Amino acid sequence: MARRRKYEGLNPFVAAGLIKFSEEGELEKIKLTPRAAVVISLAIIGLLIAINLLLPPL
């Protein structure tokens, strides 16, 4: 529980360690919810896997 209280007021990205504390203000300019960020990252990963399967290395 102590860990949860420690990160209670923080941006979810900062609490997860995805960005540095000094960069927190920069993230606020991008209007993304944490759920949207996860969906976008999963879509990018899926796209890269599909490209790898369709276009084998030369």
UniProtKB/Swiss-Prot annotation:
It is a single-pass membrane protein. Residues 1-33 are cytoplasmic. The chain crosses the membrane at residues 34-53. One of its GO terms (cellular component) is plasma membrane. Residues 54-58 are extracellular. Keywords: Cell membrane, Membrane, Protein transport, Translocation, Transmembrane, Transmembrane helix, Transport. InterPro entries: Preprot_translocase_SecG (IPR023531), SecG/Sec61-beta/Sbh (IPR016482). Disulfide bonds: none annotated. GO terms for biological process: protein transport. It is found in: Cell membrane. It holds the Pfam family Sec61_beta. Component of the protein translocase complex. Heterotrimer consisting of alpha (SecY), beta (SecG) and gamma (SecE) subunits. Can form oligomers of the heterotrimer. Belongs to the SEC61-beta family. Involved in protein export. The function of the beta subunit is unknown, but it may be involved in stabilization of the trimeric complex. This is Preprotein translocase subunit SecG.
